[in-house]
Each structure stands twice: as structure tokens, then as C-alpha cells.
Amino acid sequence: GGGGGGGGVCPKISGRGFGRIGGMSARELTVLGTAGAVPTKRRGHNGYFLRWDAHGILFDPGEGTQRQMRYAGLSAHDITRVCITHFHGDHSLGLPGVVQRIARDGVGHPVRVAYPGQGQVYWERLRYATCFVDTDVVVAQPLAGEQAVVGGEEDLRILALPLEHSVPTYGYRLVEPDRVHVLADRLEARGIRGPAVGRLKAEGFLVDRDGVRVELADYSTVRRGQVFAFVMDTGVCDNAVRLAADADLLVIEATFLDSEAGLAARYRHLTAGQAGMIAARAGVRRLVLTHISERYGSGEEGRFVEQAAAHFDGDIVLAHDLVRVAVPPRR
């Protein structure tokens, strides 16, 4: 099942580098970096690559993204879109290298880059940070307003909502459209076949030869589209829950342990417990905790999962660099 209050008995899982969590999948997150503002010996700056069928979406490329992609077996040609939450360095300093690698490797398809429009000056500085032979495939998509629909993918809806951080910040929600599966055997038994089935799907109803109205809903099932959410630097806010609503996979910052809730509030970040509460309120299926402060050593990492699990009873992954996390299979 999904999230909910603590007390349920569901598996808790914790990630380690170079591993794969949740089995093989055509929809899979590769975690490139998991540190907070300061990288450590064990954790590099942010970077998250989501493979979603034919799409390859790179979120928040921090320093070292190019190199981590090499370790993960990813190339510039795999990137079809970039989504930047905000222009703090740990979420964007890898952008110049990624853009220049796209140009150098001759990527031929459009690579759309969504980012907060209020940070346009930083986008331009990063986009043209050094001398290189440029490319015209990189397409800027500045975001504005209280809700932004990010265009470009025909089979995927990407929504961006503002979060509460010290600079303009957006979180992202990817939604696969629901699909209608027609029950052909039942229609055949009713004498409805061929072009009539197409009309029924297109219009939602038809009138049969006897003058009886036939509703599509009575002869079909709906396959719910899957949802992925990416919520980076923010304090607790309603938009974090809206972005994560019914998500199959939520990637969320958990910079601090609950004992540092005061620091989290001061710098507009989340604690592990707060991340768990957001996941529970949103009904998430699998939760990935990341963006871990450099103040915590390896001996304290288990506490992140414990504190999130006090509120959320779904699967929990404490992300490590180069771990792969599958989007859970359809229910």
C-alpha cells in the first residue's frame, strides 16, 4: 500500500552505492550524488537521473555530475531533459559541464532545461560559463508563477510548484496519463466490433443497433498512470505534499535529523521525520531520502530511516551515491 501513519508493517530498505533497489525496471532512478551543501568523502553533490521509458531526465546536476554519469554507465545522449529546482551551487554547478558535453558529443535531439525564471541571470552564467563550440539543442524553459506546466513530452505531464527556500525554488511532479483498457470480449459479446470500438473509445459512448446507449465506462478498465515527484530544498509546506500526492516514487531532501529541527527551520530545509510526514500525508509508495548534511557520519545514517519510518510505513531508501532505485511496479 501507500503511506500513512506509523505502525504498519512494511519493508524498510536502505541504499548503498552501486546497488539496485527494487529489481530491474524500465523506470529507474540513478542517484549520482547525495550530499547537502558540502560534499564529503562518501557523498558528492546532487545529481539524479530518472530513466522513464524513452525519457532520460536529469535533476539538479551539481559538481561532478559528468564523472558520476560515467561511473553509472550514462552518456550525454541519454539526457532528454534537465530539471533544476534552484540555483544554489550544489544543485546547479554541474550544468556547464553537462551542457558542454551535450555539445561535444553531438547530441541531436532537443534537451529542454526547466529552471526558476527568477534565476535567469544564473542560468545564463552557467549556460555560457566558458568557451566551447555551442549547440542549439539545449532549449531553455524558465518557470514562473504558482503553477507551471512544463511542456515538451507528449506522453508525460510535468508540473512544477514553488517550494519554500531561501531562493526561488520549484519542485517537480511527473504524471503518466491514465490509460483506458477496453474489454474487447465483452464488447464482442454485445456485437460491438471494428470501427464501432474506436468510436466508443473516442466519444465515450455509442448507440447500438437497438437504440440502446452503450457507455465506455461499462466496458473498460482504467490503468492509473504512474507518478514521480522530486522535492528538493524546502521547509515544510503544502506544495511539497501536493507534488508528492500518490507518488509511486518520491525523492525528497532530508538534510537534518530531527534533533536539528531548529536548524532546518532556520535554513528552510527538512528533517528526516518531516520528510516521512510529507510522504505519509501524500500517500507515497516508495520514499528516497537524500541531500544529507555533512555533519553526519556513517554511524548516524540509520537514524534517518528510523525517524522517517516513525511517520511513514512504506518503503524507505536512504540514498547513497550511484545507487539505483526502481519505480515500484504497477499495483
Report residues per predicted region:
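Intrinsically disordered, low-complexity regions enriched in glycine and serine
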Residues: 1-7
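Conserved beta-strand hairpin/beta-sheet module of binuclear metal-dependent hydrolase folds
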Residues: 25-72, 172-174, 220-231, 249
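Active-site-proximal loop/helix segment associated with metal-binding centers of metalloenzymes
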Residues: 40-41, 156-243, 249-251
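Active-site neighborhood of phospho(di)ester-bond hydrolases with catalytic His/Asp-centered motifs
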Residues: 59-62, 79-87, 116, 228-234, ...
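Active-site metal-binding motif and surrounding structural segment of the metallo-beta-lactamase
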Residues: 63-114, 139-144
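A gly/proline- and charged-residue-enriched helix-loop-helix capping module
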Residues: 118-130, 138-144
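Binuclear metal-ion centers of metallo-dependent hydrolases, dominated by the metallo-beta-lactamase
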Residues: 143-147, 237-331
